[in-house]
Amino acid sequence: MRQPIRLLVVSVRFLLVAASGILASLPAFSESLEHCFVGNYHLEDRSDVDISPSVDGTLRWRKFDGTTGALHPQANGTWTSTRGWTKAADGMVVSFAGCDGNAIRFGGIAGTRTDFDVHEITFESHGTRLVGRLVLPRGEAKVPIVVLVHGSEHDSALTSYSLQRMLPAQGIGAFVYDKRGTGKSGGTYTQDYSLLAYDAVAAATTTRSFAGARLGSIGFQGGSQAGWVVPLAASRTAVDFAIVGFGLAVNAIDEDQQSVELQLSEKGYSRGEIRDALKVARAAEKVIASGFSNGFAELDRLRSRYSGARWYKDLRGDYTYLILPRSEAELRIMAPEFDWHTPWNYDPMPVLRSSRTPQLWILGGEDYDAPSRETRKRLQSLIAEGRDYTVAYYKNAEHGITLFEVDATGERISTRYAPGYFQLIRDFALHGTVSGQYGDAELTRPLRHD
């Protein structure tokens, strides 16, 4: 089983599964534990560890070097850790000083929770009340501030986004908000990129107003679906930088096509077999893009033709696999719960070509949910044309820029974030550029930096 919740990550595929009820079955995190222990702690070895709420009564720790694990409560009041999103114990024991304290002992190293200047803020966008939080390092100095933009997740960013603390611990402010239809915000959940971009612009405007004299520079950061939203938002308001993780420079139909191709090619199927699989996927994509209103005859014809093919059992894509086993009647019933106004054929390239905002894109070579090959190629072509883009490519990273193991059943299990991932975000927010080495990331920088 791959990791259930990632930092700022929920792909279209994961989002569709969630809407089918899987996420709804996860128990809510204990409010008391969240209140007591969530925070960013500075340790005596001069590193920081962030503690965030998770599922099934657990906590999640993250360090800036990319290591992470789940914390499980024990009867003696301590917490034991399992590595990444695996079930393997990593030997880490953690204890807290109780609900009235700010102390932690993390793997034998003492630490203290870091205090930030925190402002809870309500603002409006297109008639919808949104709830946000501005988190700043303590002091009076000007700081860059990152507006954290959602992926496609349904959960509350105010609760789940650990960057709202990890960045301030590095001297960078963060504005986090629950997008419409999630958490404490009003409105209806949507995947309308344009509307979400206007919400992000409203968040940036609110940030400028509340940060006042402390605002140095300002920019957007987001992952996955935010790869479509962030550049749109940056085209509508003046910002100093934009950071996209595991996003796409193609549309959502191409996303599924490329996912099918990557998955089947890695399983060793021939080019001819993959071409046939892509035909089936294209028929499924047409059904979902139509709002489950047409395309069923072609889908049925191709399913009947290829259901006996050896590759059919491995045909998944980003969302094709949800369509394949269901009848027309079942799919039509599903239509209302997927009525999210998703612009399936949205072309992001005109916005990317016209951008004058320095942008950092962080991509994973093993990303099944948002395959990066064509996106990387397109971004590199923009760099060759003189655009101000930086691409950091982690060959072995999957969606979320996490590394993984493969278990005996062939399932990926995420183990940690790629080394250098969080440092990339920090340095680009601080300087509008990156320099040096970030783990094994392959960097393509704008021509002006060469």
Identify the meaning behind each predicted range:
Residues 191-210:
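Alpha/beta-hydrolase active-site loop
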Residues 245-351:
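Accessory cap/linker subdomain of secreted extracellular hydrolases
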Residues 368-374:
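Conserved alpha/beta-hydrolase "acid-adjacent" motif
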